[in-house]
Protein backbone atom coordinates (compact mmCIF):
# COMPACT_ATOMS: atom_id res chain seq x y z
CA UNK A 1 0.00 0.00 0.00
CA UNK A 2 2.77 2.42 0.83
CA UNK A 3 4.49 3.20 -2.43
CA UNK A 4 6.86 5.91 -1.25
CA UNK A 5 8.35 4.84 2.05
CA UNK A 6 9.45 1.48 3.26
CA UNK A 7 8.30 0.07 6.53
CA UNK A 8 10.74 -0.64 9.31
CA UNK A 9 9.94 -4.34 9.02
CA UNK A 10 11.03 -4.74 5.40
CA UNK A 11 14.10 -6.92 4.76
CA UNK A 12 15.75 -4.22 2.65
CA UNK A 13 15.68 -1.80 5.55
CA UNK A 14 17.32 -4.46 7.75
CA UNK A 15 19.98 -5.06 5.14
CA UNK A 16 20.76 -1.35 5.04
CA UNK A 17 20.98 -1.24 8.82
CA UNK A 18 23.44 -4.15 8.91
CA UNK A 19 25.63 -2.62 6.22
CA UNK A 20 25.66 0.70 8.05
CA UNK A 21 26.58 -1.06 11.29
CA UNK A 22 29.66 -2.59 9.67
CA UNK A 23 32.51 -0.18 9.62
CA UNK A 24 34.97 -0.11 6.73
CA UNK A 25 38.38 -1.59 7.53
CA UNK A 26 40.83 0.82 9.06
CA UNK A 27 43.83 2.11 7.16
CA UNK A 28 46.08 -0.57 8.63
CA UNK A 29 43.69 -3.31 7.41
CA UNK A 30 42.20 -4.27 10.79
CA UNK A 31 38.45 -4.26 11.32
CA UNK A 32 37.47 -2.21 14.39
CA UNK A 33 35.84 -4.18 17.18
CA UNK A 34 32.06 -4.42 17.03
CA UNK A 35 31.89 -4.48 20.82
CA UNK A 36 33.29 -0.96 21.02
CA UNK A 37 30.67 0.28 18.58
CA UNK A 38 27.87 -1.43 20.50
CA UNK A 39 29.08 0.11 23.76
CA UNK A 40 29.13 3.56 22.15
CA UNK A 41 25.61 3.07 20.79
CA UNK A 42 24.36 1.90 24.17
CA UNK A 43 25.79 5.02 25.80
CA UNK A 44 24.11 7.23 23.22
CA UNK A 45 20.75 5.48 23.50
CA UNK A 46 20.55 5.64 27.31
CA UNK A 47 17.83 8.12 28.23
CA UNK A 48 18.63 10.60 30.99
CA UNK A 49 17.47 9.46 34.38
CA UNK A 50 14.05 10.84 35.22
CA UNK A 51 13.94 12.90 38.40
CA UNK A 52 12.26 10.95 41.15
CA UNK A 53 9.40 12.63 42.92
CA UNK A 54 9.13 12.36 46.68
CA UNK A 55 6.48 9.79 47.61
CA UNK A 56 3.15 11.34 48.51
CA UNK A 57 1.40 10.38 51.71
CA UNK A 58 -1.16 7.70 51.02
CA UNK A 59 -4.40 8.07 52.87
CA UNK A 60 -7.12 5.47 53.11
CA UNK A 61 -9.51 7.75 51.22
CA UNK A 62 -7.17 7.91 48.23
CA UNK A 63 -6.57 4.17 48.26
CA UNK A 64 -10.30 3.38 48.35
CA UNK A 65 -11.20 5.70 45.47
CA UNK A 66 -11.41 2.94 42.87
CA UNK A 67 -12.73 0.23 45.11
CA UNK A 68 -16.07 -1.44 44.53
CA UNK A 69 -16.62 -1.77 48.25
CA UNK A 70 -19.12 0.56 49.80
CA UNK A 71 -18.05 2.38 52.95
CA UNK A 72 -19.44 1.05 56.19
CA UNK A 73 -22.45 3.01 57.41
CA UNK A 74 -21.56 5.47 60.12
CA UNK A 75 -22.97 4.64 63.52
CA UNK A 76 -25.54 7.14 64.79
CA UNK A 77 -24.24 9.54 67.40
CA UNK A 78 -26.92 8.60 69.92
CA UNK A 79 -28.39 5.11 70.36
CA UNK A 80 -32.03 6.30 70.22
CA UNK A 81 -31.56 8.34 67.02
CA UNK A 82 -34.12 7.17 64.47
CA UNK A 83 -33.31 7.04 60.75
CA UNK A 84 -34.76 9.86 58.71
CA UNK A 85 -38.18 9.13 57.21
CA UNK A 86 -38.17 8.55 53.51
CA UNK A 87 -39.81 11.26 51.50
CA UNK A 88 -40.81 11.62 47.88
CA UNK A 89 -37.94 11.70 45.43
CA UNK A 90 -35.37 9.87 47.56
CA UNK A 91 -35.90 6.42 46.09
CA UNK A 92 -38.39 5.16 48.64
CA UNK A 93 -40.71 3.75 45.97
CA UNK A 94 -38.00 1.71 44.29
CA UNK A 95 -36.71 0.27 47.54
CA UNK A 96 -40.17 -0.88 48.66
CA UNK A 97 -41.14 -2.78 45.50
CA UNK A 98 -41.10 -6.42 46.71
CA UNK A 99 -41.65 -8.10 43.35
CA UNK A 100 -38.63 -6.54 41.66
CA UNK A 101 -40.57 -5.19 38.70
CA UNK A 102 -41.84 -1.69 38.09
CA UNK A 103 -45.04 -1.01 39.98
CA UNK A 104 -45.13 -4.45 41.60
CA UNK A 105 -46.26 -6.27 38.43
CA UNK A 106 -43.62 -8.99 38.59
CA UNK A 107 -40.24 -9.36 36.95
CA UNK A 108 -39.40 -7.38 33.87
CA UNK A 109 -40.26 -9.36 30.73
CA UNK A 110 -36.96 -8.36 29.10
CA UNK A 111 -34.81 -9.49 32.01
CA UNK A 112 -33.73 -12.85 30.57
CA UNK A 113 -33.87 -11.94 26.90
CA UNK A 114 -30.18 -12.42 26.13
CA UNK A 115 -30.21 -16.25 25.80
CA UNK A 116 -33.32 -16.03 23.64
CA UNK A 117 -31.63 -13.53 21.33
CA UNK A 118 -28.56 -15.76 21.01
CA UNK A 119 -30.69 -18.80 20.19
CA UNK A 120 -32.70 -16.79 17.65
CA UNK A 121 -29.53 -15.53 16.00
CA UNK A 122 -28.17 -19.05 15.69
CA UNK A 123 -31.47 -20.27 14.20
CA UNK A 124 -31.51 -17.42 11.66
CA UNK A 125 -27.90 -18.12 10.66
CA UNK A 126 -28.66 -21.81 10.18
CA UNK A 127 -31.73 -21.02 8.07
CA UNK A 128 -29.74 -18.59 5.93
CA UNK A 129 -27.00 -21.18 5.43
CA UNK A 130 -29.47 -23.88 4.40
CA UNK A 131 -31.31 -21.56 2.01
CA UNK A 132 -28.01 -20.40 0.52
CA UNK A 133 -26.86 -23.95 -0.13
CA UNK A 134 -30.23 -24.86 -1.69
CA UNK A 135 -30.14 -21.76 -3.89
CA UNK A 136 -26.61 -22.46 -5.11
CA UNK A 137 -27.42 -26.14 -5.73
CA UNK A 138 -30.47 -25.26 -7.87
CA UNK A 139 -28.45 -22.79 -9.94
CA UNK A 140 -26.09 -25.51 -11.17
From Swiss-Prot:
Keyword set, alphabetical order: Cell membrane, Differentiation, Membrane, Phosphoprotein, Transmembrane, Transmembrane helix
Subcellular location: Cell membrane; Endomembrane system
Residue ranges crossing the lipid bilayer per the database entry: 116-136
Record has Hydrolase as a keyword: no
Parts of the chain on the Cytoplasmic side: 1-115
GO biological process: adult walking behavior; cerebellar granular layer maturation; cerebellar Purkinje cell differentiation; negative regulation of cerebellar granule cell precursor proliferation; radial glia guided migration of cerebellar granule cell
PANTHER family: CELL CYCLE EXIT AND NEURONAL DIFFERENTIATION PROTEIN 1
Residues recorded with modification Phosphoserine: 10, 78
InterPro entries referenced in this protein's UniProt entry, alphabetically: Cend1
Comp. bias (Low complexity): 71-81
Polar residues composition-biased segments: 1-10
Comp. bias (Basic and acidic residues): 35-46
Keyword field contains Transmembrane helix: yes
Cellular component GO terms, alphabetical: endomembrane system; mitochondrion; plasma membrane; vesicle
Region (Disordered): 1-111
Extracellular side: 137-140
Tissue: Found in the spinal cord, cerebellum and cerebrum, where it is localized in neurons.
Protein name (Swiss-Prot/TrEMBL): Cell cycle exit and neuronal differentiation protein 1
Membrane topology per record: Single-pass type IV membrane protein
